[in-house]
Design a protein with these regions (language model features):
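Short, residue-level hotspots on alpha-helical faces of the histone-fold
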Residues: 14, 77, 98-101, 125, ...
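Residue-level detector of well-ordered alpha-helical segments, enriched
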Residues: 7, 11, 54, 71, ...
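FKBP-type peptidyl-prolyl cis-trans isomerases
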Residues: 3-12, 19, 23, 79, ...
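Short, tandemly repeated low-complexity microdomains enriched for cysteine and small residues
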Residues: 28-33, 112-115, 137
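Alpha-helical oligomerization segments
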Residues: 133-173
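Conserved mixed alpha/beta catalytic, RNA-binding, or beta-rich assembly cores of soluble enzyme
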Residues: 41-47, 67-130
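N-terminal interaction modules that seed assembly of large macromolecular complexes
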Residues: 2-73
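Conserved, well-folded catalytic cores of nucleic-acid-processing
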Residues: 18-22, 61-64, 78-85, 102-106, ...
Length: 173
């Protein structure tokens, strides 16, 4: 699962809408909803920016040290921890924690009525739906490459090209 910048506004709007409709949070006034959406977007954009920095530093470090791309995940995880974020399977939990903390401290949220666990339970499906775009994209790309044998150089090249096309078409680029 991966968070895409194009998905930030829909996620933020849906999270705030769901939390308001389930009466988990109460806002200071009707106009504050836009501000809370902007606060959620800010949390998500901050995560994306830090993740981008971690990815860039990981690539640089692997290049400088001559280590293989097979160590990317391990090095990325260590650098992410150094930068104070979680990546990979733990990213969803980390992002949910950040959004809950923001809701607790936001001046636009008058009251948080639900426990942290309930907030997370209401937000998680929204994030999973939008962050699961990766697996949908992968299924679509693989369906278009049935004529090639997986693992061959031609398959790798076509997979990358088709993946770019599908992501661009879906606005995930």
């Amino acid at each position: 699962m991966r968070l895409y910048s194009a998905k930030v506004p829909p996620i933020a709007q849906e999270v705030v809408r769901v939390l308001l409709s389930s009466k988990d949070i109460d806002l200071e006034d009707a106009g504050a909803q836009k501000e809370v959406v902007a606060d959620v977007e800010s949390v998500l954009r901050s995560y994306l920016e830090t993740e981008r920095v971690v990815d860039d530093k990981t690539r640089d470090l692997l290049e400088r040290t001559g280590r293989g791309a097979n160590e990317f995940g391990k090095v990325r995880e260590q650098l992410a921890e150094h930068h104070g974020i979680k990546v990979g399977d733990e990213s969803l939990d980390f992002i949910l924690d950040q959004v809950v903390a923001m809701l607790m401290h936001s001046s636009h949220v008058e009251e948080v009525y639900a426990e942290d666990v309930v907030l997370r339970r209401h937000m998680a499906p929204i994030f999973k739906k939008h962050m699961g775009a990766d697996s949908d994209v992968d299924v679509e790309v693989r369906a278009q490459l049935k004529h090639l044998k997986e693992g061959t150089a031609a398959w790798d090249i076509e997979y990358a090209r088709t993946l770019d096309n599908v992501k661009r078409r879906r606005g995930l680029g």
